[in-house]
Amino acid sequence: MTQALQALIDQAWEDRTSLSPKSAPADIREAVANVIGQLDAGTLRVAEKQGKDWIVNQWVKKAVLLSFRLEDNAPMSAGGFAQFYDKVPTKFANWSGDDFAKAGFRVVPPAVARRGSFIAKNAVLMPSYVNIGAYVDEGTMVDTWATVGSCAQIGKNVHLSGGVGIGGVLEPLQANPVIIEDNCFIGARSEVVEGVIVEENSVISMGVYLGQSTKIYDRETGEIHYGRVPAGSVVVAGNLPSKDGKYSLYCAVIVKKVDAQTRAKTSLNDLLRGD
């Protein structure tokens, strides 16, 4: 079933310029709807960790992108307090109290999640936004005005602080989703975009900006990473001097490494303030 579904999505992607809400064949519509439904239920993911590596299911991402070609904009309501005009319905549009109780997470108004996103048990959505294809795992807090971009993968027991931006894959088009692994803390107003991976047990301080071109400087070793924050890193915003010493450019600085036990026993303030 999955192989046949993947083959149909891959072919539809090749023919995407010819697809529209009026012209798309029924089998393609059904295939895309199937994928979006599985993403919504958490039975299918855009990216999965296999061993130490993350594997991106590109065909699933293609289905998300195709879904925008297959639907017209339509009026929709959210909680009865506002009207919207969009191609993707909200995740909770037709949910009952029993549906929320079974799902086992909290949604604080006016948080919005799009259909095709998955929210696991014991997660909390403060007034925030979770886009289509995103996966938010158990025990994670998405704090006020934080944004989880399309297809982003957020691990267990993560805290996305107020105003955090987790980039998506739709606009601008990205090859791989942003991944925040288990037990990470992302400080207020920080941005993680362009498929950057923040590995488990890491702490990102307030106001840190991470993209594929951002230098991530380890002050203990002098090593520079791109696109990946190593596990257990404590990261703050910083600058590195130019070779001629005339100017400096923004970077992120790994000020220390901590293991899971230290991370659990030490307050965030102590981690960020300590030498």
From Swiss-Prot:
Pfam families: Hexapep_2 (PF14602), THDPS_N_2 (PF14805). Its EC number is 2.3.1.117. Keywords: Acyltransferase, Amino-acid biosynthesis, Cytoplasm, Diaminopimelate biosynthesis, Lysine biosynthesis, Repeat, Transferase. SUPFAM superfamilies: Trimeric LpxA-like enzymes. One of its GO terms (biological process) is diaminopimelate biosynthetic process. It is found in: Cytoplasm. It catalyses: (S)-2,3,4,5-tetrahydrodipicolinate + succinyl-CoA + H2O = (S)-2-succinylamino-6-oxoheptanedioate + CoA. Gene3D superfamilies: Hexapeptide repeat proteins (2.160.10.10), Tetrahydrodipicolinate-N-succinyltransferase, N-terminal domain (1.10.166.10). InterPro entries: DapD_Trfase_Hexpep_rpt_fam, Hexapep, Hexapep_transf_CS, THP_succinylTrfase_dom1, THP_succinylTrfase_N_sf, Trimer_LpxA-like_sf. GO terms for cellular component: cytoplasm. Belongs to the transferase hexapeptide repeat family. Homotrimer. This is 2,3,4,5-tetrahydropyridine-2,6-dicarboxylate N-succinyltransferase. It comes from Cupriavidus pinatubonensis (strain JMP 134 / LMG 1197). The lineage of its organism: Bacteria, Pseudomonadati, Pseudomonadota, Betaproteobacteria, Burkholderiales.
